Structure formats: C-alpha cells, structure tokens
Amino acid sequence: MLLNSVLLIAMQPMGKISEYRNQLAECPRWHPAENSLYWTDVSAEQLLRYHPDDGVEVVCDDVVVGGFTIQRDGSLLLFMDEGTVGHYRDGKVVKDILSLPEVNTRFNDVTADPDGRVLCGTMPGKDHPGHLYRLDTDGSFERLLTRVQVPNGLGFSCDFDRLYFTETNNQIIHAFEYDRETGKIANRRTFADFRQSSGKPDGIAVDTDGNVWSAQWGANSVVCLNTDGEQIDQIDVSAQYVTSITFGQPEQDRLYITTAQASEPNVDDSGRIFTAEPGSTGMDLRHSQIHV
C-alpha cells in the first residue's frame, strides 16, 4: 500500500533511558529474565545493556553484531560480520560457532520464529547482493531470497502465518505467507510502500492487535501501520535517524526506540535510546533454539 496520507490517532510523549549516545544503535531486545534491554552499537563494535536500576553498560567490546536473538536458555545468539554467528553468555563471547558459505558479508536484522528458527538478512556489498536466510535449529542455513537491497526489520503477524520483511533502500515492507511447519515463505506482496515518504523503513515490531510499528530512518519518527498497511499513528523522535524498536517491560507495554548519530556528531538527541508508552502491547518474546 502506498502511503500518501497519514491518519494520526495520537502523538505519544517521549523519554530517554539515559544521556548515553551510541554511534549506530540497532536490534533492541527486552530480556524478560533479566528485566533488561540489550542492543548492539554496530559502528562502535559493542553489545550493550540497560537495567532500570543500573543504567547503561557495555557488556562486550570488539564485536560487530548486526542483530541477535535471545535463546531459550537466556543466552544471546549473535549474528556478526563475515557471515558468522557467535554466542554470548555470562559476559563471554564465543565467535564463529556457525558461518555462511559466502564471505565478506555482515548480518543485519534478525528475528526468531515461534519454533526456534531464525530469519536473518545479510548486507549487500560491492561485489554481491544482500540475501535473506533461515537458520534452522540444527545449525543449517537455507537461502530464502536473493538480491535484497539492505535487508532490515523482520516480524510476524499474531497468528504467525505472515512474515513482514523490510527492504530499506527500496523503501518497502513486504509481506509473505509463512509456513510454520517448514519455515518456507511464499507469495510476496507489498505491505507498505514508503517511496513517497521522507523516511526509509528500518526495524519493526508487531503489537498484539497485529499493527506493525516501523522505525523511519531519516524522518525523526516511528509509524504504526494497521494490518492493511495503512498508517494509523506516529511517534515523533528528537533524532533524525531512527533505526529500530521493540516492546519491553513485564507487560510489554513500553516501546524502546534506537537511533544513530548524524554525520555531524551530537546533533539533537541522535544516538540515544528513547522510550514511549504507545497504548499498545507487544507480542511475547520469541526465543531462538539453535543447537550451539
């Protein structure tokens, strides 16, 4: 659906979790067992955590993490540069536990399905396109899509029969039929078309009403789309480059919003992590269950 107009239900007040600035914050994930928010700073090569009592801390340095999932045992599965997958537990990272056959590529956004598989995108390079893969629980990869222009936000409908997949540079969110039994996708269609908008769609989150919340890179905002792809709400953010979002807290009723710094550092609140109460609740966390 082409987004020519905007119907706003409400403008939500914003807050910041701290004054800490990231270079390129991505992939926020709420860890229920730890009552903490994790995210990655891709450019700074760091994995970070926020706890309401302790503030922000860097839990790991020297890791280029495009995205990650929370395993059912509470550890983190890290999707990294060079097409490799690592494992984080108790402050320690084990790198290269799994890898793609292709080289010179970096994983970007990822999401777990309800059966423990992981859908994961890889970035295009000068000599190769981006791809979308599925990582099965036995540690094997299957390529689902090729020639992808900057794969980004991934999410599922409430009944898990629809997969949402964002191509940022094409400014489109696609929808596919998803087969839970096999993990295969089919019948791609355009869910939302942002080519006449000022922003580019980035990370996404889905609420319990089936609405899709999309971070808007370059447009100082997060938009909410109903199940037909129509924009029904918007949250304004005091940072131009909004990268991703997730629901968190015990009731999944708080939205956490990551951003990146502009080319000129310390402009507005760029690079900070924001929080809002959107009046919606997020779907329960889906854990990965990859044998590592």
Report the location of each language-model feature.
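A short beta-strand motif characteristic of beta-propeller blades
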Residues: 14-18, 55-60, 94-100, 140-146, ...
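Beta-rich, blade/repeat-based domains predominating
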Residues: 19-34, 62-80, 101-118, 124-126, ...
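Hydrophobic/aromatic beta-strand positions that recur at structurally equivalent sites within the blades
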Residues: 40, 50, 87-89, 135, ...
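A short loop-to-beta-strand structural motif that recurs across blades of beta-propeller domains
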Residues: 46-48, 84, 131-133, 172-174, ...
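Flexible "stalk/tail and boundary" regions
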Residues: 52, 72-73, 89-91, 133-139, ...
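Short loop/turn segments immediately following beta-strands, especially the blade-tip
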Residues: 176-183, 278-282
